[in-house]
Amino acid sequence: MLSKSLFTIAILLLWLLAFCVGAFIDSNPLRARLAQEFDIETFLLVISAWIPTNLAFLSILAGLSGALCRSFLRSVEVGIEQIRPGKERSRIIGGGVAGLLFYLSLMAGAFLLMNEPFETTTKQQYFRVAGVVSFIGFLAGFRPDLLRRILNNLPGF
């Protein structure tokens, strides 16, 4: 139980760190510099701060935190001795996968609707999209059947 608590705190701190990186680091000049000359430090900053990749991190971390919250609630409801660790671990990993699936469906929709949805990005755009992605990623991890219902309402799924 203690290790799951520490893992949950680590996931929440990583989500907060990823959100702050996406919110406070402007990736547009970094991407321009990277296009001229490659260096690993700039590359890693672009990977962590550019909206599409940052949203992937946020979505996966939100899915994991949703699954971890569900796991904590489940252990309170049925008792910790009734929970099988292997099955619980796969549910938590499934939460991260559900967050990733939502992110992939969002990206597919963004590129279907616009030619270059992330060519130039703004902080306002980031705050709007990051909030929605994180919230639905959390719900997808907390209640995986919810993701299925959301995707069923989208044409083509």
Question: Residue locations for each model-derived region?
Answer:
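N-terminal soluble segments of membrane proteins
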Residues: 1-93, 107-133, 148-157
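Hydrophobic alpha-helical transmembrane segments in multi-pass integral membrane proteins
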Residues: 99-109
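Hydrophobic transmembrane alpha-helical segments of multi-pass transport and channel proteins
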Residues: 134, 138, 142, 146-147
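Core segments of transmembrane alpha-helices
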Residues: 93-99
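Short, electropositive, low-hydrophobicity segments enriched in small/polar residues
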Residues: 70, 99, 145
